Amino acid sequence: MLRSVVNNNDKAKESEQSVRVATDDPTYQSYAFQPSTSSSNISWFGGLRTKLSQLSLFPDWMSQLGIKSDDEKMETSSTSSPQSEQSIGEYDESTLVFRPVQLDHFGGAGQEDDGEQVDIWDFGATFLADLDSNHVWNDTIERQHFGPLKDLITTGGGANKINNHSFKTHSLLHPTWCDKCGDFIWGILKEALKCEHCNYTCHARCRDLVTLDCRSPGSSLASSTEFDSIYPQLDGTLGTIPKGLILPPAMSSSTGSDKENGNGNSAGISAENPIFSVKNSFTLPKSFSPVDSLRTKEPSAPPESRYATLRVVERYVKEDTPFEWTDEYKEMDLERKIHSYNSLAKGMEITLHEDGVNFGGHIHVNMNLSRPISVVQGVIPPTVYDVVNTAKSTAKTTSLRTITSFFLPRNTAKVINIDSKTTARKMIVTLLKKFRVADNPRKFALYECEQITDEATCTLNRKLTRISDDACPLKVVLNWQSPHCGRALVLQENDTGDILWDAFEIPELENFLRILGMEEKQYVFQTQQKYQQYRYHLDAELRQRGHSVPDAAAQPMVQTNPFLDEEFLRNQDEYGTSDSMLFSGTIKNAIMGEDPDYVNLEYLKKQNMDQSTNL
């Protein structure tokens, strides 16, 4: 590690902020900076922070930005070693926490964590202790979990653009996130693009940047390329199956791939999903039951009448109140409930802690994701050139990282270890951090899936209940009394409109309200202007045909909504107030002096009015 240190005590105050620190550690490459030599900027920032520190919400906001207060700095300096005062940042590999450079003194950050590495699926108290810090629990709209996501190279799907998606304009009834850039898509007048086959959702501006192949939700593991068989083709009937033979359906495994589940000649499960509207079907016997599937039954009817189509009906239930706050959950006689659960859960036991209140154990989480996820790769090791020329190119060289998008196989099951104090939101955030998933944690939600089979109608009723972010998944599992009761924890996209608006910051909520009010006024103005245009051209047509019109309507002017803040709109680019919101093309065209998209003046002028009334 190369460092240039100023040891002159007389010039220490003058050159304290101009000390140039260089390092060959690849961890710090993404935080390379050009130190400022002006002391006026530092004093200006210190005075501004002193003025703003009088506000009640300022300390929390500063902590989210990574700038510590004076009390936190004293605690950090008291616990740090002399070696830590020389580093410019801190990198904790077990929790992937990035802490920025302090503006007051560049050499006053903490040291690296020398503790033992936590198991990849161990979400015990050692790992969850860091979730209380502001650096980890920074679940904002922007993707900030792995440091600044800059200088990334897209590797998923190759470097060429993919055009096999069937994108359709999709009106957003509920807010969501873009699968390409990860920005927030929100607004009544906003229209996103959604693929009909793989549910890929993105901005209109991100369509040309998509490099991921289209893949239907039911074939996430199926290969898109067909390879020729290496075996020769045999003539005759050698090894063939008679056409009149009816084969029983192959029983599929819950953890197998789609090819193992019988995605061959016979179809899949007929699923009616209100979110994705995906429908497949495969043939199963009428006597099929998930509980009694291993039990052999005698055929009671001819083979042709023993088969029917299994119909799967999914019903989503919103859970507003945390489960442990309801009357159904009781913490009385906790030791007896844990003993009863462990007698049926072999290998998934729950252990009661010494305090007699908290407990921990293993749970199954099925990751049923239909939309792609983006994974950030770690820092690339430095080359020999970077090590030799570190002192010259530290301020110009940035760390090169990659981000890869792919479809996670459906029903991917993971076993994790949590305790009774871990909430659903913390578990989701921690799980995504371990996978280095760059998607916003609010994009996902945890559901409790309950399956009930109706043999009379050959229907599998699946009830998905949203587990509140404040609820503890381990307490929910303990209330099942058995891990084999037909229930499971499912992690999937939060596309049911259950966005927790109370988790946003106050400036973000105020911005949402302002944009929502502007869009409401713009929508009303569009409707009024549309019918004024029709009235004007109808009156003109009646006068042309010789009919007397008592009150001739004046031609309305094509202009923007006078209720909108034009100065505010002029300062917006095509990305809106930030990279996470879009303004409609109507507002943009009106500002630029063009005709709005919702009024087709050329058609009304050139065509007859009897044809224009069919619009």
Curated annotation (Swiss-Prot):
Residue span, SARAH domain: 498-545
Disruption phenotype: RNAi-mediated knockdown results in reduced survival in response to oxidative stress induced by sodium arsenite.
Zinc fingers (Phorbol-ester/DAG-type), renumbered ranges: 164-214
Record-level GO BP terms: actin filament organization; chromosome condensation; morphogenesis of embryonic epithelium; positive regulation of phosphorylation; positive regulation of response to oxidative stress; regulation of vulval development; signal transduction
UniProt biased composition (Polar residues): 251-268
Key words, A-Z: Cytoplasm, Cytoskeleton, Metal-binding, Microtubule, Zinc, Zinc-finger
Pfam family of the protein (one): C1_1
Region (Disordered): 1-29, 69-89, 249-268
GO molecular function: small GTPase binding; zinc ion binding
SUPFAM superfamilies listed in its UniProt record: Cysteine-rich domain, Ubiquitin-like
Feature: compositional bias, Low complexity: 76-87
Location of this chain's protein in the cell: Cytoplasm, Cytoskeleton
SMART domains per UniProt: C1, RA
InterPro entries: C1-like_sf, DAG/PE-bd, PE/DAG-bd, RA_dom, RASSF1-6, SARAH_dom, Ubiquitin-like_domsf
Gene3D superfamilies: 1.20.5.110, 3.30.60.20, Phosphatidylinositol 3-kinase Catalytic Subunit, Chain A, domain 1
Coiled coil, from the record: none
Domain Ras-associating: 396-496
Its biological purpose: Involved in embryonic morphogenesis. Plays a role in the organization of apical filamentous actin in epithelial cells of the developing embryo. May play a role in let-60-mediated vulval development. May induce nuclear condensation. Positively regulates the oxidative stress response, and this may be in association with the small GTPase rab-39. Not required for muscle integrity.
Assembly and interaction partners: Interacts with rab-39 (GTP-bound form). Interacts (via SARAH domain) with cst-1; the interaction is required for the phosphorylation of cst-1.
Entries under PANTHER family matching the protein: RAS ASSOCIATION DOMAIN-CONTAINING PROTEIN 1 HOMOLOG, RASSF
Protein name: Ras association domain-containing protein 1 homolog
Organism of derivation: Caenorhabditis elegans
Gene name linked to the record: rsf-1
